[in-house]
């Protein structure tokens, strides 16, 4: 009986010390699109509500009487400096109305799986041509609420380790 009490006491008093500490992310991190295993740069941006993915050649199509989009994700190969294009096709979840300099723009929003650190997140991304930006992804507040705190003084703190 005493051994049992000691075990319970040990479990209650010491477990927080061994609990996983919450991750603090840098303002720029590497991320992976899964299951395609495409490595991207992501900027964690608390000023954006919906996450945004750099998408090129966006084409709206109909598939099984539903709205879909085909698009390319462009990544610069760090070894060669050449562009690599990865084709994607996803159903449109909704349209996002965004204010731009000359009015409004409607962007398709798709769901994608993104690996941050060792965890896989199923998130929504508005598709937009972000050519010329260093980060292919902006992670907005809807995604950041799942990730945790952002330290604006840090970058590249936790590489993605999810396996395809």
Predicted stretch roles:
Residues 1-5:
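Positively charged n-region of N-terminal signal peptides that target proteins for export
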């Amino acid at each position: 009986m005493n051994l049992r009490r000691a075990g319970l006491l040990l479990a209650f008093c010491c477990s927080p010390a061994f609990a996983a500490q919450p991750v603090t992310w840098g303002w720029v991190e590497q991320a992976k699109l899964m299951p395609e295993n495409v490595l991207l740069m992501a900027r964690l941006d608390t000023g954006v509500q919906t996450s945004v993915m750099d998408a090129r050649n966006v084409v709206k199509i109909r598939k099984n009487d539903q709205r879909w989009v085909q698009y390319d994700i462009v990544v610069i190969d760090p070894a060669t400096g050449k562009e690599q294009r990865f084709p994607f096709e996803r159903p449109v979840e909704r349209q996002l109305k965004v204010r731009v300099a000359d009015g409004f723009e409607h962007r398709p929003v798709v769901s994608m799986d993104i690996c941050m650190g060792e965890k896989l997140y199923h998130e929504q991304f508005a598709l937009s041509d972000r050519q010329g930006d260093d980060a292919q992804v902006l992670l907005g507040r809807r995604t950041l609420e799942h990730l945790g705190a952002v330290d604006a003084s840090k970058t590249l703190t936790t590489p993605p380790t999810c396996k395809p």
